[in-house]
Regions:
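N-terminal "arm"/small-domain region of PLP-dependent enzymes with the aminotransferase-like
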Residues: 2-61, 69-70
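Conserved C-terminal alpha-helix-loop-beta "cap" of PLP-dependent enzymes
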Residues: 294, 302, 306-309, 313-403, ...
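Active-site beta-loop-alpha junctions enriched in small/polar residues
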Residues: 156, 185-187, 322, 348, ...
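Short, acidic Gly/Pro/Ser/Thr-rich loop/turn segments
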Residues: 18, 36-40, 228-229, 290, ...
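PLP-dependent enzyme catalytic core of the Aspartate aminotransferase-like
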Residues: 78, 101, 119, 128, ...
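Conserved N-terminal alpha-helix of the aminotransferase class I/II PLP-enzyme fold
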Residues: 39-91, 113-120
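Conserved PLP-enzyme active-site core in the AAT-like
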Residues: 2, 18, 80-311
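Short amphipathic alpha-helical segments
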Residues: 52, 78, 279, 283, ...
């Protein structure tokens, strides 16, 4: 179906024909733990990866399969793996690449959970990271070591929506025989497709824009199929005979889909962060309206950014659409149709003013999620990024007066009126 447009693909890929058993047009929820093999030979072929298909519910499910095919198609990859959460997706990617003493070069302005995983959790398993100013290519290159396994970035940094130069970073990674891993949660394949700019692995928290309604946890890993896992010798679990899977080389068995096949067959098999059929079904409902929702998110965001930029109680707006933003040129290059509905601004004052503003909003919900159809708000320094030291917070551009907004799809007049209420409360202090 590759000749179809995005809006058509988001509705049809993975279920081009009605369900063969029931003729259902909607994707069914296949609530089963296991699958019947025709005979012993068929079972052996499935376990040996010579016959593609369902083996056990921890690894695959037919509802999940539709979601995976759809996201892979939307991102322009060869295959995808859906798992229980975005955190699980990120962890599996980093485990697969970094095992046995690996090292990552990572953008320092990333989601706080990813930062903590790289800075504190993975070092306990012998995997380390160097955080860099991703906009300084010399600094990025100097951080690469002999045991570096990947460069890790986000299309839109969390929470300030800063933008890395994906093309340049892909070229640098490939110069050293490394894959570029891109978290495209905030970008979405509707606004940007990192694989077209040289990314090798794309990861999503599907909980956010892909699902879009704040109802469902999920994560997706997309394999571009373009990276040569055997060339450098750094990835034996993927390229060499794997002792935990009766000597199978995933490169030989799965070809361009080797990376996600390894994660499914080994890491997911052994640690079980499996997405449920119902969660996969709910995420598919979100994906079907992705383009429609994103158009409204982008439209509303432009108006909110304009409003905040002119407000006397706002010290600074951190949004790449603004001409004075340091990555404005990259925003125009990578996001010609707009983007960045999750961003921050700095209110005049400090924590007291920030909290007062947030506590007097009515439409905006104070919660930890983002990229919902409902508008959301949070104070990063005391919540999502509170595990960071003061120095780490400032290094990531998060100040005591920083407020993160996630602009929803409500009517723009109501969104702006709600922001007025917050500012009125601050003015009354």
């Amino acid at each position: 179906m590759s000749h179809y447009k995005f809006e058509t693909l988001q509705l049809h890929v993975g279920q081009e024909q009605p369900d063969p058993a029931t003729d259902a047009r909607a994707v069914p929820i296949y609530a089963t733990t296991s699958y019947v093999f025709r005979n012993c030979e068929h079972a052996a072929a499935r376990f040996g990866l010579t016959d593609a298909g369902n083996i056990y519910g921890r690894l695959t499910n037919s509802t999940q399969d539709v979601l995976e095919k759809r996201i892979a198609a939307l991102e322009g990859g060869v295959a995808a793996l859906a798992v229980a959460s975005g955190a699980a997706a990120i962890d599996y990617v980093l485990q697969a690449l970094g095992q046995n003493g690996g090292h990552f070069v990572a953008q320092k302005t990333i989601y706080g959970g990813s930062y903590n995983l790289l800075e504190h959790t993975l070092p306990g398993f012998g995997i380390t990271a160097t955080f860099v100013n991703i906009h300084d290519l010399n600094e990025v290159e100097k951080a690469i070591r002999p045991n570096t396994r990947a460069i890790y970035i986000e299309t839109l940094g969390n929470p300030n929506s800063d933008i890395p130069d994906i093309d340049a970073l892909a070229a640098l990674a490939h110069k050293y025989g490394l894959p570029l891993v891109v978290d495209n949660t905030f970008g979405t394949p509707y606004l940007i497709r990192p694989i077209e700019h040289g990314a090798d692995i794309v990861v999503h928290s599907a909980t956010k824009f892909l699902g879009g309604h704040g109802t469902t946890l999920g994560g997706v890993i997309v394999d571009s199929g373009k990276f040569d896992w055997a060339a450098s010798g750094k990835y034996p679990a993927i390229a060499a005979p794997n002792p935990s899977y009766h000597g199978v080389s995933f490169v030989a068995a799965a070809g361009p889909a080797a990376f996600v096949t390894y994660i499914r067959a080994v890491l997911l098999r052994d640690t079980g962060a499996t997405i449920s059929p119902f969660a996969a079904f709910l995420l598919l409902q979100g994906v079907e309206t992705l383009s429609l929702r994103l158009d409204r998110h982008v439209e509303n965001t432009k108006k909110v950014v304009e409003y905040l930029s002119k407000h006397p109680l706002v010290e600074k707006v951190n949004h790449p659409s603004l001409p004075d933003h340091p990555q404005h040129d990259l925003y125009q290059k990578y996001f010609p149709n707009g983007g960045g509905s999750i961003f921050t601004f700095e209110i005049k004052g400090g924590v007291k003013e920030a909290h007062t503003f947030i506590d007097h909003l009515e439409i905006f919900s104070l919660l930890a999620n983002v990229a919902d159809v409902k508008s959301l708000v949070i104070h990063p320094a005391t919540t999502t990024h509170s595990q960071l030291t003061e120095e780490e917070l400032l290094d990531q551009g998060i100040k005591p007066n920083t407020i993160r907004l996630s602009i929803g799809t409500e009517h723009i007049d109501d969104i702006l009126a709600d922001l007025d209420k917050g500012f009125a409360a601050v003015q009354a202090l």
